[in-house]
């Protein structure tokens, strides 16, 4: 079995799993100084874009391609390459298709998609710089966003018309969305060949008018929010994934309004994401390793169900880890009760335990 991985930044998460399964690994990477280039069996430094990875997949006679790209801009080119390569050869590319990327990479199209499939999403309208004062019909506070962007980029919680005016000093248009006071929830869904399985919902904290970046929040799992049925989160996530009809990882963000007792869908990411460590800690399923299983033809809902475990877990920003040495593989819970991830100085620790009490003791000892 030979797999081409596109991008090296996330590869250390799965290097141990690739080796355990006897898979020959090739990486294409556009940055010759990128991390993890010493890990795979073979590396090709290539120009940006998908033309070279496509040609290398063919020339090296690989069995599958797994893009490991955790940012949004390249996803449409990856999707186009997927459709071209799969049409021209029998090489599967474990990634979202063009339709799914177009629907999820534009927040306005995502809103329209939710409405089409009957999934509740916060009230919204599109505003323009020239006439927003007369067109704005929603009560404050509202959330202003751009169609594209990730990680909280270009988002502002506006509490007054002056806040909106300030936002339009930089932008010509905005998606204006009702501010939902409540709980932030994320969930990963795995999908391949028409099979979809939602994993454990993650609690990311309460919404704030300050709009705290996700990387600065403490996250916990399983999601324990009063009044919220986690089965509803999983059913809704499954419905979204099934209607997107694509392959790979889907990370979905939701808000739960306690006042309205309503679950709202916010957005979808069709790529590896920051939730994956906490998901793995909680339920024992590593979404990146499942991409490898998809490539190897070993992915199935039954296999996922057989792997499911049940732990209490938390993810905490720590900056720089100063605790005990971890066991190999470092990015796996196979021989560890916690893993450390993120760049030096901006590290996070994800800890798991059999009980809430044991988790609290771990946190007290480590943090």
UniProtKB/Swiss-Prot annotation:
User: Reaction catalysed by this chain?
Assistant: hydrogencarbonate + NH4(+) + 2 ATP = carbamoyl phosphate + 2 ADP + phosphate + 2 H(+)
What Pfam family is a match for this entry?
ATP-grasp_3
Do the record's keywords include Phosphoprotein? no
Give start and end of each ATP-grasp domain: 111-296
Q: Which domain of life is it from?
A: Archaea
Q: Which coenzyme or cofactor does it need?
A: Mg(2+); Mn(2+)
Q: Which EC class heads this enzyme's classification?
A: ligase
Q: What InterPro entries does its record include?
A: ATP-grasp, ATP-grasp_PylC-type, ATP_grasp_subdomain_1, CPSase_Archaea
Q: Which UniProt keywords apply?
A: ATP-binding, Ligase, Magnesium, Manganese, Metal-binding, Nucleotide-binding
Binding-site residues for Mn(2+) 2, renumbered to this chain = 267, 269
Q: How is the cofactor bound?
A: Binds 2 magnesium or manganese ions per subunit.
Q: Does the keyword Zinc apply?
A: no
Q: Which GO terms describe its cellular component?
A: cytosol
One GO MF annotation is:
magnesium ion binding
Q: So where does ATP get bound?
A: 137-186
- Describe its assembly: Forms homodimers and homotetramers (dimers of dimers).
Q: Which family does it belong to?
A: Belongs to the small carbamoyl-phosphate synthase family.
* Further remarks about this protein from its record: Several lines of evidence suggest that obesity is associated with elevated levels of intestinal methanogenic archaea. Consequently, this enzyme may be an attractive drug target in the treatment of human obesity.
Give the protein's biological function.
Catalyzes the synthesis of carbamoyl phosphate from ATP, ammonium and bicarbonate. Proceeds via a three-step mechanism, i.e. the phosphorylation of hydrogencarbonate to carboxyphosphate, a nucleophilic attack of ammonia on carboxyphosphate yielding carbamate, and the phosphorylation of carbamate forming carbamoyl phosphate.
- For this entry, the protein name equals Carbamoyl-phosphate synthase
Q: Which organism is it from?
A: Methanobrevibacter smithii (strain ATCC 35061 / DSM 861 / OCM 144 / PS)
């Amino acid at each position: 079995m030979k797999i081409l991985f596109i991008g090296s930044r996330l590869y250390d998460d799965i290097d141990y799993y690739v080796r355990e399964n006897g898979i020959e690994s090739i990486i294409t990477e556009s940055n010759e100084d990128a991390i993890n280039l010493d890990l795979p069996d073979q590396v090709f430094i290539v120009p940006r874009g998908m033309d070279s990875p496509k040609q290398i997949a063919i020339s090296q006679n690989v069995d599958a391609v797994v893009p490991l790209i955790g940012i949004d801009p390249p996803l449409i080119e990856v999707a186009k390459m997927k459709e071209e390569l799969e049409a021209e050869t029998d090489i599967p590319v474990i990634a979202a298709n063009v339709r799914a990327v177009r629907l999820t990479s534009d927040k306005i199209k995502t809103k329209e998609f939710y409405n089409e499939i009957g999934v509740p999403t916060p009230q919204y309208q599109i505003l323009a710089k020239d006439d927003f004062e007369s067109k704005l019909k929603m009560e404050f506070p509202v959330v202003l966003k751009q169609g594209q962007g990730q990680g909280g980029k270009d988002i502002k919680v506006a509490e007054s018309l002056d806040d909106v005016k300030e936002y339009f000093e930089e932008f010509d248009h905005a998606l204006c969305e009702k501010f939902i006071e409540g709980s932030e929830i994320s969930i990963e869904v795995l999908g391949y060949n028409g099979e979809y399985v939602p994993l454990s919902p993650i609690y990311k904290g309460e919404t704030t008018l300050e709009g705290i970046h996700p990387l600065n929040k403490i996250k916990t799992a399983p999601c324990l929010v009063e009044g919220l049925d986690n089965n509803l989160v999983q059913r809704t996530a499954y419905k979204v994934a099934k209607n997107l009809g694509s392959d790979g990882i889907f990370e979905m963000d939701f808000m739960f309004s306690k006042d309205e007792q309503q679950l709202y869908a916010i957005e979808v990411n069709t790529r590896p994401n920051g939730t994956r460590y906490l998901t793995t800690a909680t339920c024992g399923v590593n979404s990146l390793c499942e991409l490898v299983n998809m490539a190897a033809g070993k992915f199935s809902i039954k296999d996922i169900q057989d792997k499911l475990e049940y732990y209490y877990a938390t993810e905490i920003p720590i900056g720089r880890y100063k605790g005990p040495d971890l066991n190999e593989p470092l990015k796996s819970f196979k021989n560890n009760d916690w893993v450390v991830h993120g760049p030096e100085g901006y590290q996070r620790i994800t800890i798991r335990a059999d009980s809430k009490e044991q988790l609290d003791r771990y946190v007290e000892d480590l943090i």
